[in-house]
Amino acid sequence: MVRITMEDGGIIDIELNEEVAPITCENFKKLVKEGFYNGLTFHRVIPGFMIQGGCPLGTGTGGPGWNIKGEFAANGVNNPLKHTRGVISMARSMNPNSAGSQFFIMHKDAPHLDGQYAAFGKVVAGMDVVDKIAAVRTDWNDKIGRASCRERV
């Protein structure tokens, strides 16, 4: 279980699915343990679709300095997780093996992403916080608030 604590005290608890996406989960847990995500923002918010975070630059262009294999069907990995409301998945470029630290949480269902991105867990508490973030008025430069991400005991 991983907990994201927002600057305003809002909490999002995420259960990771290590059986389906072991590489992705291991990478995510490593970044959490190192404190990589602490103080970062949800830099991309698209209401009715998803909220995205995990970029150290806050622009959508940064990462941890390495990439991992994309664990999804179009990349030869059996990953039956669907991109439904509350699912967490890895963001990437057009390169299927370009995921590093950026992730997104589904605000609404997006079946067109199934098999194309590495879903690796689901929000088990705190969808009200995701809804609140998704409701914030945004433009290309808005930052949503700092978050601290840590493993929950």
What are these regions (language model features)?
Residues M1-R150:
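Cyclophilin-like peptidyl-prolyl cis-trans isomerases
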